Amino acid sequence: MRSLKIILLSSAFNGLTQRAWLDLRQSGFDPSVVLFTDEATVCRQIEAADADLVICPFLKDRVPQQLWSNLDRPVVIIHPGIVGDRGASALDWAITQQARRWGVTALQAVEEMDAGPVWSSCEFDMPAEVRKSELYNGLVS
C-alpha cells in the first residue's frame, strides 16, 4: 500500500504552513510544498506530482478550478474562522467584533469561496485584547 501523497499549496512557507508540514511529517507523511506563483504553474506542479490530497494552510489566491474540480484529488482549505464564516479577513473581523469564541475550519475547495463541505473544525475561547499575529501564530496554528 502506497503512502498518501500530500501537497501543501501555500502563498508562503509561513508559520501555519510550517506547522502543517511538521505535523504531517510527525504523522508519518512526506508532504511536498508548492508556493502559489501563477495558476498555470501551480496546476502543472500539482498534476505532475500526482498528489492524492492538496491542503492549503495559507492561500491568498483562489484555488484554480482545474484543481478543486478534480474529485479524485480533494483540495482542503484551512480557514481561520468558525464554521459558517466565509471570506477574507476572518481574524480581523473576530477581533474587531470582540468575538468570544472563534476557530479554525478545514473545508473542501469548491467554486464559491469558503462554501465547501467541512472536513473538520476546532473552536476556542478568544483571549481578551489579542493581537492578530498572536492569534494566528498561537491558537489558529
How should each PLM-predicted stretch be described?
Residues 59-141:
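Donor/substrate-binding cores of folate-linked one-carbon enzymes
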Residues 6, 31-33, 75, 104:
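Hydrophobic anchor at the start of a short beta-strand
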Residues 9-13, 36-37, 52-53, 57-58, 74:
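Structural motif
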Residues 42-50:
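Short amphipathic alpha-helix with an adjacent loop that forms part of the alpha/beta core around
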Residues 2-24:
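N-terminal beta1-alpha1 ligand-phosphate binding loop
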